[in-house]
Amino acid sequence: GGYTMLIDAAESQYYPVIEEFLQEQGVERLDVVVASHPHSDHIGAMAKVIQNFEIGAFYLPDKPHTTATYERMIQALEDKEVAVYPAAGSKDAAIAWDPLVTASILSPVEGVSYDDLNNVSAVIRLSYGDTSILFPGDAEDEAQEIMLSKLPLSCFPSSVLVIAHHGSSNASSDPFLQAVDPSLAVISVGEGNDYGHPHQEVLDNLERLGIPYY
């Protein structure tokens, strides 16, 4: 239906890459933007995105941060008078977006307190017809366990799983992988990163469960 959504915006130096890609797709308006959580590798370029594109609605977890990067994003939202909504998960939470696509918010689960910023990540499941994609941000084992305990298991099965936290070993538990049961997995990771992502344990788990990954 021509509707657009952007989830996260990398470090600030990658804004030209984001802008070039969106322009190549003919995108001038982003109907929905999601900032999964306030770490700079997810919102570093977000202020520039807000400044340079029309945005219909902006979602982020209700977990303020004190960094200059976060403050720039909030200031840009205020300057552009963008409608901002909390990303709060439940079995019925959804983003009003494309009428042909269901965009469910699974986490952070309403009423739960999270200490680690990674675990407040907005976990988004998009479904269109028989195809679905789960975007878990940096949600680690704790957040995944809470989702599994608080939400119906029917919320999780997805055709494609973006592996949480760039393939960190503390963010892809067997129960979560089995609940999602993806046909394939995608790992978003910088080559030669300082953290050793993706961790070999995660790759071994995916292979053991018969989940191809890219």
Model-assigned labels for residue ranges:
Residues G1-Y214:
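Non-globular, low-confidence helical/coil segments that flank catalytic cores
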